A protein has these predicted regions:
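Active-site helix/loop of acyl-thioester processing domains in fatty-acid/polyketide metabolism
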Residues: 47-70
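Short structured motifs
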Residues: 14, 79-86
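HotDog/MaoC-like acyl-thioester-processing domains
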Residues: 1-16, 22, 89-96, 100-184
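Short, intrinsically disordered C-terminal tails of secreted or membrane-associated proteins
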Residues: 233-240
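Short amphipathic
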Residues: 24-33
């Protein structure tokens, strides 16, 4: 089933369901369909991220976070993800996605999503997400407080801190590469302008010299009409060749 249809079906299943605590683990049950499979006849690695989005949407509704986001006209943006695959999911097997909020900082909130079948963890997806609004990013603590949770974030596990650090380092690397490309483009543009100016200057100088020689030749002919005409190309005649 296409993820959007799955998402719609999950939304219908949530009608009338009560809210759960912000730090509770939400569970949504799904089934593997043929379009989830790759050539090895198990769920494609990239498909796990699409399925994890469904688990994330389920968490947003069950905890009431969706209403708070709407109030602020904000939307969640994933700024990094890692995945660990342990066992296969095959066609038509049922499984659950267990989603929980691990903790948060001044910008990012961290989620863990486990793919579970018969109480066995088949894989894990972890993401860091930020709340975006027209005014910019919203501090997670502001949104979490509006959900009635005033306590500080639980301590982040070591692997989550390393994941966050790795994402920051990679982001900085990409930003530096973009800056280098911009500098290189500006340098090439400036070099091209310098070359164009040099060519224009040389051309202007050549025209001035040719014009001066033509004027001297004309003056000599007027003073000494019986002498042979000077063989000097004027700028106009040079251009026509």
């Amino acid at each position: 089933m296409f993820p959007w249809l799955r998402l719609f079906a999950v939304g219908l299943s949530l009608i009338g369901k009560s809210k759960v605590d912000l730090l509770a683990t939400t569970r949504v049950r799904l089934r593997v369909w043929p379009n989830d499979l790759d050539f090895n006849l198990h769920v494609n690695n990239g498909r796990y991220l699409a399925l994890a989005n469904i688990g994330g949407a389920h968490w947003f509704v069950r905890t009431g976070a969706l209403g708070i986001f709407r109030k602020h006209k904000a939307f969640p943006v994933i700024g990094g993800a890692i995945a660990k695959f342990r066992h296969d999911l095959k066609a038509f097997q049922t499984f659950e996605i267990h989603t929980r909020l691990i903790g948060w900082g001044s910008k990012w909130a961290f989620f863990e999503q486990r793919f579970v079948r018969k109480e066995r963890v088949l894989g894990v997806v972890a993401v860091r997400a930020v709340a975006k609004a027209q005014s910019g990013s919203i501090d997670p603590q502001v949104l979490i407080a509006e959900l009635g949770h005033n306590a500080p974030s639980p301590e982040l596990p070591e692997w989550v801190r390393r994941f966050d650090q790795s994402a920051e380092l990679l982001g900085e690397l990409l930003r530096n590469e973009e800056r280098s490309k911009v500098v290189d483009q500006h340098s090439m543009s400036a070099l091209g302008q310098e070359r164009t100016y040099a060519v224009q200057t040389a051309t202007s100088a050549s025209h001035l010299i040719a014009t001066a020689k033509a004027a001297a030749c004309t003056r000599s002919y007027l003073l000494h009409p019986r002498q042979r005409t000077c063989a000097v190309q004027t700028p106009m005649s040079a251009k026509g060749q």
